[in-house]
């Protein structure tokens, strides 16, 4: 499966009377987009805002971040199972609006959603502060329940990103990157002297709006499955998830998974990258045992020498992470685990809820319990009063001057467990 990503660099976004791309600027017909989104009669109000890096703007609570992509050649379309049909994606050509993103927000009671500050110290913790963002803020009818509310906002984000991407249809690429996932027998034979490595991609699936979708299917309902890395780039996996903001994988992160990109970087040089095994993080012990057993079985069938395993979320999924580590090790597969830590504000507590001697190579994305003070912004998009309620916030988080004291857990992407964040680790 061979996929070309044609990247079009976006250096500005503006509202205009026609949606188009010209001179690295994305122009958006606000009225046309509004009419598209308003087709869902469950939505009562829509507000569109454009924000740029360095703007004194706070977005809260953030639901999802999505990169506009358009499939121009090959089977299927971007976001299969939602925007396009169920055809297998991951081959052909896909255009990417690099530097632009869609951010969704809205008043959803009880959600563990987070903050994006476009300026100040908070901006340094969120990778999304570096994008030119179209923020879509939607209200829905009062009788809409939480699960349906999440579904409405999820579709609003995907529809908006797909609408914007259509502007790239006739725009020449500034940069082209090619990725290929060969059939397994062919891939194994290509570099017989290099260790065979795969990526174990854990997807949040705890339920209660902690969900991820694969080709439109709730990941709670899947068993571990082999995928081409190129399918992921075409939007086969999307976020429907309201887990803590710091380490949730937004749809943007799935589209731009840095673990996959890094594995391709040294493919054929240091190792033979054999592909992706997706698995879930269900809450029952039986589901955890089943998924980790089948993950280890697939690794054994591929004759893997090693695997990179990434977690999404914390607490309950720590058990899935360690089960995967232990069972892969029992099959002779070496592992490197990627996670983040909840080690207390002083960093002295146990970092994970589970542990095992097999987990002897671990990459940390940071301690989510660290506290930061975010200064007031000139403009707030959304509802700042949610700062006391979101994960990482606490009673008294909001100060009279508009500043917010929170754990970095509340900042979208601060400790992302795919490494899509700005933190680093140092030894002293």
PLM feature spans:
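Glycine-rich, charge-decorated loop segments at or immediately adjacent to ligand/cofactor-binding or catalytic sites
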Residues: 342-360
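A general structural motif
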Residues: 282-296
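Long, compositionally biased, glycine/small-hydrophobic-enriched stretches that function as flexible linkers
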Residues: 1-223, 395-428
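Membrane-embedded hairpin module used as a gating/binding unit in multi-pass transport
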Residues: 188-280
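A short helix->loop->beta-strand "cap" motif at the edges of active sites that frequently abuts
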Residues: 330-336
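Proline-aspartate-enriched helix->loop->beta-strand connector
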Residues: 303-304, 308
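Extended, charge-rich low-complexity interaction segments
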Residues: 362-395
């Amino acid at each position: 499966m061979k996929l070309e990503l044609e990247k079009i660099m976006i250096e500005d976004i503006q509202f205009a009377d026609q949606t188009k791309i010209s001179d690295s600027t994305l122009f958006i017909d606000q009225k046309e987009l509004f009419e598209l989104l308003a087709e869902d009669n469950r939505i009562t109000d829509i507000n569109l805002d454009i924000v740029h890096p360095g703007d004194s703007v706070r977005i809260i609570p953030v639901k999802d971040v999505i990169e506009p992509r358009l499939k121009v050649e090959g089977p299927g379309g971007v976001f299969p199972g939602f925007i396009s049909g169920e055809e297998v994606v991951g081959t052909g050509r896909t255009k990417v609006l690099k530097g632009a993103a869609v951010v969704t927000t809205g008043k959803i009671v009880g959600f563990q959603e987070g903050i994006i500050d476009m300026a100040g110290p908070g901006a340094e913790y969120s990778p999304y502060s570096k994008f030119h963002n179209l923020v879509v803020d939607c209200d829905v009818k009062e009788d809409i329940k939480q699960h349906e509310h999440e579904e409405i906002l999820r579709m609003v984000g995907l529809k908006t990103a797909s609408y914007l991407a259509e502007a790239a249809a006739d725009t020449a690429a500034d940069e082209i990157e090619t990725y290929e996932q060969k059939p397994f027998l062919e891939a194994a034979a290509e570099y017989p002297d290099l260790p065979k490595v795969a990526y174990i991609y854990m997807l949040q699936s705890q339920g209660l709006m902690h969900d991820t979708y694969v080709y439109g299917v709730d990941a709670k309902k899947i068993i571990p499955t082999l995928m081409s890395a190129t399918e992921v780039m075409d939007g086969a996996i999307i976020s429907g998830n309201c887990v803590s903001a710091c380490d949730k994988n937004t749809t943007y992160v799935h589209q731009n998974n840095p673990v996959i990109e890094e594995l391709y970087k040294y493919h054929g040089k240091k190792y033979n990258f054999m592909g992706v095994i997706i698995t879930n993080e269900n809450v029952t012990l039986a589901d955890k045992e089943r998924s980790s057993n089948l993950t280890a079985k697939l690794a054994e069938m591929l004759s893997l020498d090693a695997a990179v395993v990434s977690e999404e979320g914390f607490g309950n999924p720590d058990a899935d992470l360690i089960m995967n580590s232990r069972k892969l090790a029992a099959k002779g597969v070496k592992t490197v685990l990627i996670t983040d830590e909840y080690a207390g504000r002083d960093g002295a507590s146990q970092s994970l809820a589970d542990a095992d001697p097999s987990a002897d190579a671990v990459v940390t994305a940071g301690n989510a319990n660290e506290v930061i003070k975010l200064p007031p912004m000139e403009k707030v998009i959304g509802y700042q009063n949610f700062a006391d309620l979101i994960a990482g916030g606490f009673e008294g988080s909001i100060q009279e001057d508009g500043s917010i004291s929170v754990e970095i857990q509340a900042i979208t992407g601060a400790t992302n467990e795919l490494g899509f964040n700005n933190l680093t680790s140092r030894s002293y």
